[in-house]
């Protein structure tokens, strides 16, 4: 009789341990499945935020002839958004640093973006401004000067700048999206 009680208690204890182990195992499996789903359905991604601004006065636009070998040619001024900085403050700062002009009330008019090989996104917020103060001056980014808007297509534009220019000029467009197709960069204007 005592033997049967010990055996029953021992089996009960074993069953409890097995039950708890099974619950932990099932919970762990469900947790792993949850994490896998969360990773594949992630709503966040790594993004580099930058800006570019078309500063204009009448039929003239301010251009920057970039000297950076990685991205050289005619563009508009702009640069990176710093951590904790508002987008508008960033474009005002960048235009000032690269041109000496302090723009007033820049208007967001579109975006340019693409996905890098590492899966991160690069996003350029596009602004327009026609009010500014200050004296025009060059920076280490390159020479800045006024050009006739109509002459821009004949100038040596930086890579993919012609599509971006269309977003600046056409109110029906809001995005210049670059993507890889069969190993070649393609462009989609939306």
Question: What is the role of each PLM region?
Answer:
Residues 6-10, 17, 25, 32, ...:
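Short, positively charged and aromatic/hydrophobic N-terminal segments
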Residues 40-62, 77:
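Conserved N-terminal beta-strand and adjoining loop/helix that marks the start
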Residues 60-96, 182-190:
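Conserved Nudix-box catalytic region and its N-terminal flanking loop in Nudix hydrolases
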Residues 102-110:
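A short coil-to-beta-strand element that immediately follows conserved catalytic motifs
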Residues 114-135, 164-167, 172:
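Active-site-adjacent beta-strand/loop module that shapes the phosphate/pyrophosphate-binding cleft
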Residues 128, 137-169, 186-189:
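NUDIX/MutT-family hydrolases
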């Amino acid at each position: 009789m005592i033997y049967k009680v010990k055996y029953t208690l021992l089996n009960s204890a074993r069953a409890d341990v097995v039950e708890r182990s099974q619950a932990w195992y099932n919970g762990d499996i469900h947790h792993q499945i949850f994490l896998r789903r969360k990773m594949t359905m992630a709503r966040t991604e790594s993004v580099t935020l930058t800006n570019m601004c078309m500063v204009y006065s009448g039929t003239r636009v301010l251009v920057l002839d970039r000297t950076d070998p990685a991205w050289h040619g005619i563009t508009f001024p702009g640069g990176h958004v710093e951590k904790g900085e508002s987008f508008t403050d960033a474009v005002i700062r960048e235009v000032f640093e690269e041109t000496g002009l302090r723009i007033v009330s820049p208007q967001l008019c579109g975006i340019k973006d693409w996905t890098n090989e590492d899966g991160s996104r690069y996003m350029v917020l596009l602004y327009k401004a026609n009010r500014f103060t200050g004296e025009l001056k060059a920076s280490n980014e390159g020479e800045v000067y006024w050009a006739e808007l109509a002459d821009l297509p004949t100038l040596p534009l930086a890579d993919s700048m012609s599509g971006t220019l269309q977003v600046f000029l056409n109110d029906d467009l809001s995005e210049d999206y670059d993507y890889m197709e069969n190993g070649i960069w393609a462009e989609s204007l939306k």
